[in-house]
Regions:
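Tryptophan-anchored aromatic micro-motifs
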Residues: 111-130, 225-236
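N-terminal glycine/threonine-rich, aromatic-flanked beta-hairpin/loop signature
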Residues: 127-182, 212-222
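SH3/SH3-like beta-barrel superfamily modules
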Residues: 22-33, 61-104
């Protein structure tokens, strides 16, 4: 059985939530935040570690049942003591994301690609960001996200909230910050801490993941693009 399937089964048994947006929004991220890609290199399964209520500690009570296996790739958000906070997102069709703590000794950095490969369809559930070549060496970014689509009553009553963007960018490197709703119709690099009605997004390419964080103004109520997306097959 694949590692992501094992993890999904374990987390279901534990009652862990499937996050609609597992990433924090831009306003909550610390200055200089830079997620990185790392790989499980431990010789045995790396169990998640509890934090809080007397944990972490070298006890069974502080060890989660859920685990990852050698070769699994995670997004590292930060470090606390001997542990790192990570996000693991499985593949299609569920794209289940899990956020938790792992022993730092179980991970090793993955070298960044020499040339960022932005082009592709990046998905998490029904939400997606599609990136395609555009004239002049730029890239077209199209995104769609929703909230409430899993509630049949909301669907029947038209109560599903949505968000979308469509813009053209020329990223330099493996991250980009932009506002698709800038007044002049052109993408702009904005300070996410500035109070603005404009939608602001920041993307980090950590292949096979695309990490996104927005300022909470990119769609209807509760809609967010703040998530971890994985490469997915292109829509026919």
């Amino acid at each position: 059985m694949r590692a992501c399937a094992l993890l999904s089964l374990l987390l279901t048994a534990l009652g862990a939530p499937a996050f609609a947006g597992v990433m924090d929004g831009l306003d909550s991220l610390p200055a200089g935040f830079a997620p990185r890609l790392e790989k499980i290199v431990a010789a045995k399964p790396a169990h998640f570690v509890k934090h809080g209520d007397g944990c972490p500690a070298a006890t069974d009570a502080c060890t989660e049942k859920a685990y990852l296996v050698p070769g699994d790739l995670v997004i590292v958000l930060g470090t606390q003591g001997d542990d790192v906070e990570v996000i693991f997102t499985g593949g299609a069709p569920r794209f289940r994301s899990t956020r938790g703590w792992l022993p730092r000794s179980a991970l090793a950095p993955v070298p960044a690609a020499a040339t960022p490969a932005w082009v592709g369809r990046w998905a998490n559930g029904d939400d997606f960001i599609a990136i395609t070549p555009a004239p002049g060496g730029s890239l077209a970014f199209v995104g769609s996200a929703s909230w409430g689509g899993g509630d049949p009553a909301r669907v029947a009553n038209g109560g599903v909230n949505v968000g979308a963007f469509d813009t053209t960018l020329a990223p330099r490197g493996a991250s980009v910050t932009f506002s698709p709703s800038a007044d002049d119709g052109k993408p702009a690099t904005l300070d996410p801490k500035v109070d603005s009605d404009d939608c602001v997004l920041r993307l980090w390419l950590l292949d096979p993941y695309l990490v996104a964080a927005d300022n909470g103004k990119c769609g209807g109520m509760n809609v967010t693009f703040s998530n971890v997306y994985r490469r997915a097959p292109a829509k026919p």
